[in-house]
Amino acid sequence: MNVLVVEDNVDIGDAVSSHMVADGHLVDWCVNLKDATCRLTSKKYDLVLVDLGLPDGNGLSLLRAIRREGDKTPVIIMTAQDQYSDRLAGIEGGADDFLVKPFDLDELSARMKQIRR
């Protein structure tokens, strides 16, 4: 599976990317919305993992842009923001799942498998 990870925290981005590579996935990792947008216009992904709090904006804007283009690529939000309003905004924006940091990497793998069904 080709996966785009959009995460500005180096420790989390490295852990998530390494875990997915170990599971046999191909991973591109971006730390901001600008780079993620460039990647999405040049390559097709099977899954996008996006943080809400990024240095150049909110991950919801990336999610909305993906959906506005009619792209059905599954998107999982992964964020430390655990307010009901954050979850609701993600779901209404078209996210397929929502993980609250810190999360177990095996839980991420399980949710990825569920989305692929």
Predicted feature descriptions by range:
Residues M1-R117:
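N-terminal/domain-start alpha-helical segments
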